[in-house]
Regions:
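Histidine-centered, transition-metal-coordinating active-site segments
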Residues: 1-122, 132-471
Length: 471
């Protein structure tokens, strides 16, 4: 009879990480045989919810898949990769985290290794669960019109984002399942994988970890606050997966990413997430690969041109399908809103079906000019062509005016000046708050922004797009 640990974990084959482990729910007898606590939920139960399966129907690269034909991967596979990466970081950081907690909270029992690892894994799995069709484009074109839920931990006036929706889904839709988890996958040792008696993951911890911008909440356990930069820091378990995954599926050679070296030189100190100075080269190498992906894939000229067409039709199209309300106020209906639903309807509009002069919210119909643009998009006939480009690097403030000026002025309906900016490395003001650096032999390390000085703080790709004649 095979060891009980084989019954406790499924293996998922993945081109980036090799094998991704996923906990399976064990019957009471099997739990006892494996020396694990009784459980009535496991990661497979979360994976099989409608919210997670919906991510199969949301593409990872939105409009870029019309430019890179093999980039057909989804937010679902990315979420699995982030979960796996987060678990690796949890295992690596746990010994130093327990030691730092003992120094800062003497006499307090540290959380079990299983609880720490599984909390990070669930945060990684669910960090994108709030995404809508076309992912970040949905944020910009639809969600930005609505206010975020009120949260006393941040200033008011914030626009709604997919991270806000992820927090709502985690706490209100998936919270009961999350609370019932009792172990992380691993080598089958109960002392490492199982939660301690009385421990459970608080969904509020997971919601806190996935929040952006980062929340200031002293009431959160110290160890949760220390781990927050892994999901919103200089490097994250999110971008450590998507840079490699997107490069693989687009066929782009982004350069080496040595995630293991980065992990091996990371630890938790009383300052929080800390990188030993010899790991800086691996960090710089990774940030360089990330910048390359923005320049070659995410900000590709044809991708940006397609986005200009999408920007014209996206809001009225979602309005036709979903109505005028905020997704935050109707999560039940939002669960049914994915790219399959949108593109199925867009194909009907492109054929001239459900097209009227005065559509009403939620009636599934759109105006003729919107239908015409969708027809061009679905046939991959962008109506905009880049005729000039400028690239610039800068440290603070808006993009350099002299560089932008070379593109000339826009003309409504004929010329669009498109400015795409990526933060290539953290600014000097943010860097040390996100990641501490420990010098060799106890010596002070260079400030992080200085150590990464070969990378710009911001990189601009500006383009002048002109309307294609007859489009």
């Amino acid at each position: 009879m095979p060891p009980a640990r084989f019954a406790a974990v499924n293996l998922i084959s993945d081109p980036i990480h090799g094998y991704i482990e996923l906990t399976k729910r064990l019957a009471p007898g099997d739990s006892r045989a494996a020396g694990l606590p009784a459980e009535d939920a496991a990661e497979e139960d979360i994976l099989d919810t409608a919210w997670l399966q919906r991510l199969r129907r949301i593409s990872q690269l939105q409009s870029a898949r019309w430019v890179f034909p093999t980039a057909e991967h989804s937010r679902f596979t990315h979420g699995l990769g982030v979960m796996h990466e987060a678990g690796l970081w949890g295992r690596q950081l746990y010994p130093s985290l327990a030691e730092a907690l003992a120094a800062t909270e003497p006499g307090m029992r540290p959380p079990s290794e299983g609880l720490v690892v599984e909390t990070l894994r669930i945060a990684g799995l669910l960090h994108d669960v709030g995404h809508g069709p076309f992912a970040h484009f949905f944020d910009e074109q639809v969600l930005a019109a609505f206010p975020a839920p009120t949260d006393g931990r941040r200033p008011g006036g914030k626009a709604l984002t997919h991270e806000d929706l992820s927090q709502l889904i985690i706490e209100h839709e998936l919270g009961p399942l999350i609370r019932r988890l009792r172990r992380a996958p691993g080598d089958g040792l109960p002392t490492r994988d199982a939660f301690a008696d009385g421990e459970a993951i608080d969904p509020a911890w997971v919601a806190y970890l996935v929040a952006k911008p980062r929340l200031d909440d002293p009431a959160m356990p110290r160890w949760i606050r220390w781990l927050q930069p892994l999901l919103s820091g200089v490097f994250t378990v999110d971008n450590l997966d998507y840079v490699r995954r997107d490069a693989y599926f687009t066929g782009v050679s982004a350069g080496p990413v040595d995630a293991e070296r980065l992990r091996r030189y990371a630890f938790i100190s009383e300052r929080g997430l800390t990188l030993y100075e010899p790991g800086l080269a691996a960090l710089e190498m990774f940030l360089t690969a990330r910048l390359f992906m923005y320049q070659q894939v995410y900000f590709h000229r044809t991708v940006r041109g397609i986005d200009l067409d999408l920007a014209e039709v996206f809001a009225p199209s979602i309005r036709a399908i979903f109505g005028d309300g905020s997704p935050a106020d109707d999560l039940g209906r939002y669960a049914d809103l994915d790219e399959y639903a949108l593109l199925h309807q867009a194909a009907r509009w492109g054929r001239g079906e459900d097209v009227v002069l005065t559509p009403a919210p939620g009636d599934g119909r759109i105006a003729p000019h919107v239908a015409g643009i969708w027809r061009q998009i679905l046939l991959r006939r962008p109506r905009w062509r880049a005729e000039a480009e400028v690239r610039a690097e800068f440290e603070v403030g808006p993009p350099p005016a002299e560089a932008v000026a070379t593109l000339g002025a826009g003309e409504p309906g004929r010329v669009i000046i498109d400015l795409a900016v990526v933060d290539a490395r953290p600014s000097a003001a943010d860097a040390d708050a996100l990641l501490a650096v420990a010098g060799r032999d106890g010596r002070p390390a260079r400030p992080l922004a200085e150590a990464l000085g070969r990378l710009p703080a911001f990189a601009l790709i500006g383009r002048r797009f002109v309307r294609v004649d007859g489009a």
